[in-house]
């Protein structure tokens, strides 16, 4: 089950452990990096930090919104298990309605198929270092 958790209630050691163990872990999702890149952030958490999704938070004219912080190329769902389109859709639908505007750059493992979200594709160059060196050559 996916739960919305405010910054003060996030267990940062479990959060960082999830990022470290996830198939698609990136520096941009570690709690210490989020603390530097954005002044406020909350998160969506599945079960006991099996999967997480950071929600950088801003407020303008009394409206809450989530955004892509500077120097953070990719966010989205990070998981210790396989990331399916269904899981990404569940996380996106789990963003609370109090966020009136959402603009996030999802990571390369997140492929939303839900028509109710407006999406655009960008180009990135990513070398997956999970493969052995001989394969990467």
Residue ranges, per PLM feature:
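Conserved donor-binding loop and adjoining core beta-sheet/short helix segment
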Residues: 17, 32-90
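Non-catalytic accessory segments adjacent to catalytic cores
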Residues: 84-124
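A short, aromatic/hydrophobic, helix- or strand-capping loop or linear motif
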Residues: 25-34, 103-107
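Acyltransferase donor/substrate-recognition loop-hinge adjacent to the catalytic core
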Residues: 1-6, 10, 114-137
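Short, solvent-exposed loop/turn segments at secondary-structure junctions
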Residues: 58-61, 108-111, 132
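Structured helix-beta-strand junction loops
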Residues: 21-22, 39-40, 98
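Short amphipathic alpha-helix that is part of the acyltransferase structural core
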Residues: 1-27
């Amino acid at each position: 089950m996916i739960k919305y958790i405010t910054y003060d209630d996030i267990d940062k050691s479990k959060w960082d452990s999830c990022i470290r163990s996830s198939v698609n872990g990136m520096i941009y999702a570690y709690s210490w990096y989020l603390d530097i890149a954005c002044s406020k952030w909350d998160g969506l958490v599945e079960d006991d930090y099996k999967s997480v999704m950071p929600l950088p938070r801003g407020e303008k004219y009394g409206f809450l919104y989530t955004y892509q912080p500077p120097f953070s190329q990719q966010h989205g769902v990070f998981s210790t298990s396989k990331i399916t389109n269904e899981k990404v859709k569940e996380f996106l639908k789990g963003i609370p309605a109090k966020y009136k505007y959402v603009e996030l750059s999802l990571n390369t493992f997140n492929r939303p198929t839900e028509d109710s979200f407006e999406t655009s594709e960008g180009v990135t160059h990513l070398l997956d270092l999970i493969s052995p060196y001989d394969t990467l050559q």
